[in-house]
Structures are given as structure tokens and as C-alpha cells.
Amino acid sequence: KYTRVDEIMEFAKRMGFKKIGIASCVGLIEESKIFAKILRKNGFEVYGAICKVGSFNKTDIGVDEKYTCVTGNVMCKPILQAKLLNKAKTDLNVVVGLCVGHDSLFYKYSKAISTTLVTKDRVLAHNPVGALYQAKAYYKRLLQD
């Protein structure tokens, strides 16, 4: 019986992967640091790329400042995250909490095979399946015609 962390390490070992990339949301940086430490303790080389890499402001491309308050003024750059990990020649990339769409762009541009450790869900403590578990109760409204 393995946790997702164990499964990722076992998969990497069986595939002969040595270099692991972590593409992380800034909101989950502490979790990514813990994951990186675990990977290093288990013999992997770890490379990281945070979503806000490059620090490019949303207002610089014409986004009105009133629309930047939800996630901040600095843009996420999942394609740049992928390119940085490509440059490091990672064998396996692991996504930690990238937003919907940003994760898709990361997967598209990553040259290495990629998997997910954490799926972002700010409401359900990063456990999106919780909504499905509550489909007959709290989320019943989602199934109504």
C-alpha cells in the first residue's frame, strides 16, 4: 500500500528516472519543498519551477488592475515552467497544484513524461474528489436538471 508520493518514487525507480522536476503553484511551495526533500533523501536529483517564475505583471499586458486582486498581480507562466524543466533535462515532472488550464499547458510543453501529485482545489483542501463524495448531499444541486 503506497501513498501517491510513494507511487511516484516507485514509478521513477522502475523507469530508471534520476532527475525529477517539480512544477509548483506558489501557494503550495511549502508542500513542494517537503516533497523535494523526500525525493532527495531517496536518491533523486530535484529541479523546481514555481508558477510565478519571471515575475511578469498582468497589468503589463493590459489586464485592468481591478481584475488582479484574486490571485495577485504577477502572472503564472506554466509554459516557462515546462521550458525550465526541459532545460534541466528532467526525466519525470511532477505537478503540484497548478491551476486548471495551467496544468494542461505545462503537460503540453513538457518534454518529460509528467504526473500530478496535488490537484488544486482551494475549497476542498486540494481534494477535488470530495465534491464527488458529496454528490448525493451537499453537491446534489450539481446533478439537478
Enumerate the predicted regions with their spans.
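Gly/Ser/Thr-rich loops at beta-strand to alpha-helix junctions
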Residues: 2, 24-32, 54, 96-104
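C-terminal functional extensions of proteins
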Residues: 115-145
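Electropositive, gly/pro-rich neighborhoods at or near active sites that engage anionic ligands
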Residues: 1-19, 26-30
